[in-house]
Amino acid sequence: MKLFRILDPFTLTLITVVLLASFFPARGDFVPFFENLTTAAIALLFFMHGAKLSREAIIAGGGHWRLHLWVMCSTFVLFPILGVLFAWWKPVNVDPMLYSGFLYLCILPATVQSAIAFTSMAGGNVAAAVCSASASSLLGIFLSPLLVGLVMNVHGAGGSLEQVGKIMLQLLLPFVLGHLSRPWIGDWVSRNKKWIAKTDQTSILLVVYTAFSEAVVNGIWHKVGWGSLLFIVVVSCVLLAIVIVVNVFMARRLSFNKADEITIVFCGSKKSLANGIPMANILFPTSVIGMMVLPLMIFHQIQLMVCAVLARRYKRQTEQLQAQQESSADKA
């Protein structure tokens, strides 16, 4: 019973989706169906966020340079330093490609949709999350290949205009259209916040099912033994824990408020599976891609589950803080 109190309904749903993808992955004609459905859900998510946020909130979020600077440092400085130290240390005797895979993971940009969705679920600064996560993803398309070439001796990597266009089309365009639609649908969105929250959660579940289905179809459970798999899980948990603790410490050290702390935690601790796998296809030989992205695929699932728990905890804290503020205002 204690486990069920720790794992809230959404986290349990996440685990169920992972198990569903493990036993019943999307195959054949269902693959493009779920890919298109996921794309549509993400576009709807950003459309609704655009409609929900006021012009003042967006301007304030975009101008929050201290927050954006730290998120970029967490993504492109803290993570790579940890990856280099870990690959140099090699504490366990496993396939060297797994160490290279973790190093590659640490170089990647932040994931966008889940970072923003979790920020929204937790009551964080969504406007800043949209700006910070989108900027990280766009910058990573050019910066990550350069870092790969620098620390992994892989050359010939460059930014993809197609990837930039995809981010603009799937994320920023729906957000802008939603915001432009705010005069007509803004009141409806404000009255249906619970439905908007369901959109956040549904988009995350679809991303998890689609990503894990692809991993299962590609033989994720046959590529490594149980010992190596346990190694990946433990290292992923330790790496994620270090980054989250550092982000929380720095957010409080730099005197960010609770909403900004939430944004920093969720935007500064994520790594993008959506960018990482296509980029690996360009940067590495086909024969090693599976092993290179295996740590990323497992880390991706762990970060979603851990952040689901954190989002619920932050949400309770945010609701308690709001209740205290409202109570103080009534007494005044």
From Swiss-Prot:
UniProt keyword terms in alphabetical order: Symport, Transport
Tagged with keyword Ligase: no
One term under GO cellular component: plasma membrane
Entry annotated with the keyword GTP-binding: no
Molecular functions (GO terms): symporter activity
One Pfam family linked to the record: SBF_like
Family statement drawn from the similarity comment of this UniProt entry: Belongs to the bile acid:sodium symporter (BASS) (TC 2.A.28) family.
Protein name as catalogued: Putative symporter YfeH
